[in-house]
């Protein structure tokens, strides 16, 4: 019968190897993949609200939105269609998050308008300024789970404000 002699340096080597293997299987908190602020927006949303025209009259509005989050939630493609009795909008845009600062471009096909937007993202709230050649507005959006509240203010334009509540479908 053969006897095995394990020397202390062999035990140390085996223990070190086991520790390395076990530690390599544990997640490292500092290196975990973090999702960007747009990650939870993906999907189809719909709802309604109110359009306030420059004349002071109010109209009910119905909207549908589609958000496509990309690049681990740091890029967003969006499409928004809204209609009221006298107002239609077909808005498309792309947004990029960089450390809580948002920039992007937009195009609205009904009025053939285009421009850019920039703003900030803090938690579940986005605040932005939207600009085009003939249009400027302040935009805010708060998302909580499957519900979203959206506000757009554009003093001096034909549509002075839009408020709406959307729900993920």
Model regions and ranges:
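N-terminal helix-cap/turn-to-beta initiation motif at the start of protein domains
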Residues: 31-46, 71, 96, 140-143, ...
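Short, hydrophobic/aromatic-rich segments at coil-to-beta transitions
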Residues: 42-46, 71-79, 99-105, 121-129, ...
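Bacterial N-terminal signal peptides
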Residues: 12-27
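N-terminal glycine/threonine-rich, aromatic-flanked beta-hairpin/loop signature
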Residues: 57-99
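Hydrophobic/aromatic beta-strand elements that line small-molecule binding cavities or substrate pockets
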Residues: 62-68, 91-95, 116-119, 137-143, ...
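N-terminal secretory signal peptides that target proteins for export/translocation
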Residues: 1-9
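Edge beta-strand at a domain terminus
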Residues: 30, 112-113, 138-169
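Contiguous, well-ordered beta-strand patches that form the walls/edges
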Residues: 82-134
